[in-house]
Design a protein with these regions (language model features):
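Oxidative protein folding and maturation machinery
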Residues: 1-211
Length: 211
């Protein structure tokens, strides 16, 4: 979309004026969608400052960003469960949808039908924790990032959430614990993706060699 292009360009150029223009457009869209404009701006600023490696401004916003995510998390699992039950009822009413899918695709559809909101929030918590691990040396903030990575795992135990937890732990000097979590990421990683496997193995070697 135009918004994503504008944001990507602002990050690439580290251009605050372009980013402010993007915020104005998003404020208009978010208002029309009934979203909390102020909260959406905090999240956008946090992501932008992390992307352009503005450590100080990112650190100031990280906790506020997390608070917004925790607020958004309320009742999201219930809503996802309701959507999942509705999805199953629709399958029962019209089983022709099953016949047209391969078993693998059907399994994928069923798995993701019940985690729409929670998976999206999980990745938001994960990205926030990953940005803290990458940019910050603030011990208190890193401690909080452990909680955010764990929250991501609770919402949706994707392998990248374990990978992020390992990175936070490693940044804090917990080599053994980081190794355990990176090994979990390796176990949960989808089979057959050589690029992902190489990335995780590279991080495992880094932790083992304490580089």
């Amino acid at each position: 979309s135009m918004g994503r292009y504008s944001y990507s360009r602002a990050v690439k150029e580290k251009n605050e004026e372009r980013f402010d223009s993007y915020l104005k457009v998003m404020a208009f869209l978010n208002e029309n969608l009934g979203a909390d404009v102020a909260n959406e701006e905090v999240k956008s600023r946090s992501r932008f400052y992390a992307a352009v490696e503005d450590k100080l401004r990112f650190e100031k916003l990280a906790e506020k960003h997390a608070d917004i995510l925790f607020e958004e998390e309320k009742d999201c699992l219930e809503r996802d469960h309701e959507k999942y039950m509705q999805f199953l009822q629709n399958l029962i009413k019209d089983p022709s949808g099953i016949a047209s899918q391969t078993p693998e695709h059907l399994a994928f559809t069923i798995q993701f039908a019940g985690i729409n909101e929670s998976s999206s929030l999980a990745f938001s918590f994960r990205d926030l924790a990953a940005n803290v691990a990458r940019l910050s040396d603030n011990r208190e903030l890193l401690n909080k990032a452990i909680t955010w990575a764990l929250e991501a795992i609770t919402l949706f135990g994707n392998f990248t959430c374990y990978e992020t937890l390992a990175e936070v732990l490693y940044k804090m000097g917990y080599q053994k614990e980081a190794l355990w979590q990176m090994e979990k990421a390796l176990d949960k990683m989808p089979a057959g993706n050589d690029a992902i496997a190489a990335r995780i193995h590279g991080k495992l070697d880094k932790i083992k060699n304490n580089k």
